[in-house]
């Protein structure tokens, strides 16, 4: 029996999500290290939140900032790529190809509404809407 589930995962301990411009200007070893951190975050959040295995999923991705400049809407793609790899590692999806990732929608970044909203200086918020396997 399959159904639709939705999970909101908030990574607020790694600081500002890595942007495309930042990754472009980093040494390739630094990019690899950064992606591993986001990958581990996706893995841990999936396990802690008990996200089940899914046959496929759609993703809404949004960055939240306490202060500082607001990047382009899709600038956080490098952070999300690592995060998505972590979801695959956790067994949420069998892979990150188009066969399993139905869509990725980047929502405009926003400033914090209150100091209680997140623990860190910034957060990557990933909403997963998926069909359970």
Name each model-derived stretch.
Residues 1-133:
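Catalytic phosphate/metal-binding cores of nucleic-acid and nucleotide-processing enzymes, i.e., regions
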């Amino acid at each position: 029996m399959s159904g639709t589930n939705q999970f909101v995962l908030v990574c607020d301990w790694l600081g500002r999500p890595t942007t495309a411009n930042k990754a472009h200007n980093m040494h390739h070893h630094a990019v690899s290290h950064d992606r591993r951190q986001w990958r581990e975050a996706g893995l841990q959040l999936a396990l802690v939140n008990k996200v089940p295995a899914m046959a496929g999923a759609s993703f809404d991705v949004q960055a939240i900032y306490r202060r500082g400049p607001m990047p382009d809407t899709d600038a956080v793609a490098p952070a999300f790529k690592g995060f998505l790899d972590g979801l695959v590692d956790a067994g949420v999806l069998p892979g990150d190809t188009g066969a399993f990732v139905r869509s990725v929608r980047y929502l405009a970044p926003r400033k914090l509404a209150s100091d209680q909203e997140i623990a860190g200086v910034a957060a990557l918020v990933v909403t997963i809407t998926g069909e359970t396997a």
